[in-house]
Amino acid sequence: MRCKICPRRCNAERTAEKAGGVCRMPAGLVVARAMLHMWEEPVLSGKNGAGCIFFSGCNLGCVFCQNGRISHENFGKVITPAHLREIMEDLVSQGAHCIDLVTPTHFTPWVLEALEKPLGAPVVWNSGGYERVETLRTLEGKVQIYLPDLKYAMERPARELSAAPDYFEAAAAAIDEMVRQVGAYQIGD
Protein backbone atom coordinates (compact mmCIF):
# COMPACT_ATOMS: atom_id res chain seq x y z
CA MET A 1 0.00 0.00 0.00
CA ARG A 2 1.03 3.61 -0.54
CA CYS A 3 0.50 5.16 2.86
CA LYS A 4 -1.58 8.29 3.42
CA ILE A 5 -2.96 7.35 6.86
CA CYS A 6 -1.48 10.25 8.85
CA PRO A 7 -1.05 13.98 8.06
CA ARG A 8 2.39 13.36 6.61
CA ARG A 9 0.76 11.57 3.64
CA CYS A 10 4.23 10.22 2.92
CA ASN A 11 3.04 7.85 0.19
CA ALA A 12 5.57 5.30 1.45
CA GLU A 13 5.30 1.79 0.14
CA ARG A 14 4.26 -0.37 3.08
CA THR A 15 3.93 -4.09 2.42
CA ALA A 16 4.08 -7.12 4.70
CA GLU A 17 7.75 -7.46 3.75
CA LYS A 18 8.71 -3.79 3.48
CA ALA A 19 8.49 -1.11 6.15
CA GLY A 20 8.38 2.50 5.08
CA GLY A 21 7.55 6.07 5.88
CA VAL A 22 8.21 8.08 9.01
CA CYS A 23 6.67 5.33 11.16
CA ARG A 24 9.06 2.75 9.64
CA MET A 25 6.36 0.10 9.86
CA PRO A 26 5.18 -2.53 7.38
CA ALA A 27 1.59 -3.03 6.28
CA GLY A 28 -0.19 -4.94 9.03
CA LEU A 29 0.15 -4.71 12.79
CA VAL A 30 3.24 -4.64 15.00
CA VAL A 31 2.58 -4.77 18.74
CA ALA A 32 5.28 -4.20 21.35
CA ARG A 33 3.31 -5.04 24.49
CA ALA A 34 -0.21 -5.82 25.72
CA MET A 35 -1.05 -5.79 29.42
CA LEU A 36 -3.34 -4.62 32.18
CA HIS A 37 -1.89 -1.22 33.07
CA MET A 38 -2.76 0.33 36.43
CA TRP A 39 -1.01 3.64 35.80
CA GLU A 40 -2.98 5.23 33.01
CA GLU A 41 -5.30 8.11 33.86
CA PRO A 42 -7.40 6.88 36.84
CA VAL A 43 -10.69 7.24 34.94
CA LEU A 44 -9.29 4.82 32.35
CA SER A 45 -7.57 2.36 34.68
CA GLY A 46 -10.48 1.89 37.06
CA LYS A 47 -9.88 -0.78 39.72
CA ASN A 48 -8.54 -3.50 37.42
CA GLY A 49 -6.42 -1.51 34.99
CA ALA A 50 -6.65 -0.43 31.39
CA GLY A 51 -6.06 -3.11 28.77
CA CYS A 52 -3.13 -1.32 27.14
CA ILE A 53 -1.87 -2.37 23.74
CA PHE A 54 1.34 -0.57 22.80
CA PHE A 55 1.89 -0.43 19.04
CA SER A 56 5.39 -0.20 17.56
CA GLY A 57 6.57 2.76 15.53
CA CYS A 58 5.04 6.22 15.45
CA ASN A 59 3.98 8.81 12.91
CA LEU A 60 5.62 11.63 14.93
CA GLY A 61 9.03 10.41 16.09
CA CYS A 62 9.43 13.03 18.82
CA VAL A 63 13.00 13.38 20.08
CA PHE A 64 11.70 13.35 23.69
CA CYS A 65 9.59 10.19 23.40
CA GLN A 66 9.01 8.33 26.67
CA ASN A 67 8.48 5.10 24.71
CA GLY A 68 11.53 5.52 22.48
CA ARG A 69 12.46 1.84 22.29
CA ILE A 70 8.97 0.98 21.08
CA SER A 71 8.56 4.03 18.84
CA HIS A 72 12.03 4.49 17.38
CA GLU A 73 13.71 1.06 17.48
CA ASN A 74 10.93 -0.96 15.84
CA PHE A 75 10.63 -3.25 18.84
CA GLY A 76 7.61 -5.55 18.62
CA LYS A 77 5.94 -8.55 17.07
CA VAL A 78 3.97 -8.76 13.81
CA ILE A 79 0.40 -9.95 14.43
CA THR A 80 -2.82 -10.26 12.43
CA PRO A 81 -6.03 -8.31 13.06
CA ALA A 82 -7.59 -11.58 14.29
CA HIS A 83 -4.79 -11.98 16.84
CA LEU A 84 -5.24 -8.35 17.93
CA ARG A 85 -8.92 -9.11 18.49
CA GLU A 86 -7.96 -12.13 20.64
CA ILE A 87 -5.61 -9.96 22.69
CA MET A 88 -8.37 -7.37 23.22
CA GLU A 89 -10.89 -10.04 24.25
CA ASP A 90 -8.36 -11.61 26.63
CA LEU A 91 -7.71 -8.24 28.31
CA VAL A 92 -11.47 -7.69 28.68
CA SER A 93 -11.83 -11.18 30.22
CA GLN A 94 -9.10 -10.24 32.72
CA GLY A 95 -11.27 -7.32 33.84
CA ALA A 96 -9.79 -4.46 31.81
CA HIS A 97 -11.76 -1.27 32.41
CA CYS A 98 -11.16 -0.33 28.76
CA ILE A 99 -8.99 -1.23 25.79
CA ASP A 100 -6.33 1.47 25.48
CA LEU A 101 -4.75 1.52 22.02
CA VAL A 102 -1.44 3.37 22.44
CA THR A 103 0.04 5.01 19.31
CA PRO A 104 -2.27 3.19 16.87
CA THR A 105 -2.59 5.81 14.11
CA HIS A 106 -0.29 4.25 11.52
CA PHE A 107 -2.11 0.91 11.91
CA THR A 108 -5.67 2.26 11.57
CA PRO A 109 -6.89 0.01 8.70
CA TRP A 110 -5.84 -3.16 10.53
CA VAL A 111 -7.12 -1.97 13.92
CA LEU A 112 -10.48 -1.38 12.24
CA GLU A 113 -10.56 -5.02 11.16
CA ALA A 114 -10.08 -6.07 14.78
CA LEU A 115 -12.90 -3.74 15.87
CA GLU A 116 -15.51 -4.96 13.38
CA LYS A 117 -17.71 -6.26 16.23
CA PRO A 118 -18.37 -4.50 19.57
CA LEU A 119 -15.88 -5.44 22.24
CA GLY A 120 -17.73 -5.22 25.57
CA ALA A 121 -15.42 -2.50 26.91
CA PRO A 122 -14.79 1.07 25.78
CA VAL A 123 -12.03 1.54 23.22
CA VAL A 124 -9.55 4.37 23.85
CA TRP A 125 -7.60 5.91 20.96
CA ASN A 126 -4.46 7.12 22.78
CA SER A 127 -2.40 9.03 20.23
CA GLY A 128 -0.09 11.98 19.75
CA GLY A 129 -3.00 13.88 18.21
CA TYR A 130 -1.31 14.04 14.79
CA GLU A 131 -4.19 12.57 12.81
CA ARG A 132 -6.00 13.07 9.52
CA VAL A 133 -9.69 13.85 9.91
CA GLU A 134 -10.43 11.43 7.05
CA THR A 135 -8.70 8.62 8.93
CA LEU A 136 -10.51 9.44 12.18
CA ARG A 137 -13.86 9.31 10.39
CA THR A 138 -13.24 5.63 9.66
CA LEU A 139 -13.17 5.06 13.44
CA GLU A 140 -16.57 6.60 14.14
CA GLY A 141 -18.66 4.26 16.28
CA LYS A 142 -15.65 2.00 16.99
CA VAL A 143 -13.83 4.30 19.44
CA GLN A 144 -15.60 5.57 22.54
CA ILE A 145 -12.80 7.66 24.07
CA TYR A 146 -10.16 9.75 22.32
CA LEU A 147 -7.07 10.61 24.35
CA PRO A 148 -4.83 12.84 22.21
CA ASP A 149 -1.60 14.04 23.78
CA LEU A 150 -1.53 17.58 22.39
CA LYS A 151 2.18 18.30 22.10
CA TYR A 152 2.65 21.66 20.37
CA ALA A 153 0.82 24.91 19.70
CA MET A 154 3.70 26.53 17.82
CA GLU A 155 5.30 25.55 14.53
CA ARG A 156 8.96 25.90 15.50
CA PRO A 157 9.10 23.29 18.31
CA ALA A 158 6.86 20.97 16.28
CA ARG A 159 9.30 21.23 13.38
CA GLU A 160 12.45 20.93 15.51
CA LEU A 161 11.30 18.14 17.83
CA SER A 162 8.97 16.09 15.60
CA ALA A 163 9.66 17.31 12.05
CA ALA A 164 5.95 18.18 11.86
CA PRO A 165 5.57 21.94 11.27
CA ASP A 166 1.85 21.43 10.54
CA TYR A 167 1.31 19.63 13.86
CA PHE A 168 -1.02 22.12 15.54
CA GLU A 169 -3.16 22.66 12.46
CA ALA A 170 -3.59 18.90 11.99
CA ALA A 171 -4.10 18.19 15.70
CA ALA A 172 -6.65 20.98 16.15
CA ALA A 173 -8.73 19.66 13.24
CA ALA A 174 -8.35 16.11 14.57
CA ILE A 175 -9.49 17.09 18.06
CA ASP A 176 -12.53 18.87 16.59
CA GLU A 177 -13.39 15.62 14.79
CA MET A 178 -12.86 13.57 17.94
CA VAL A 179 -15.24 15.84 19.86
CA ARG A 180 -17.77 15.67 17.03
CA GLN A 181 -17.73 11.87 17.26
CA VAL A 182 -17.84 11.29 21.02
CA GLY A 183 -18.66 14.66 22.59
CA ALA A 184 -16.62 16.80 24.94
CA TYR A 185 -14.79 15.41 27.95
CA GLN A 186 -17.06 14.51 30.86
CA ILE A 187 -16.46 12.73 34.14
CA GLY A 188 -19.19 10.57 35.59
CA ASP A 189 -19.58 7.45 37.66
Positions of predicted regions on the chain:
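Auxiliary Fe-S-binding modules of radical SAM enzymes
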Residues: M1-A19, G183-D189
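Conserved Radical SAM active-site core
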Residues: A19, R24-Y146, M154-R156
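Alpha-helix N-cap and loop-to-helix initiation/capping positions
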Residues: I79, S162-A170
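A general structural signal for well-ordered alpha-helical packing
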Residues: L136, E140, F168-I175
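Conserved C-terminal portion of the radical SAM core fold
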Residues: A170-D189
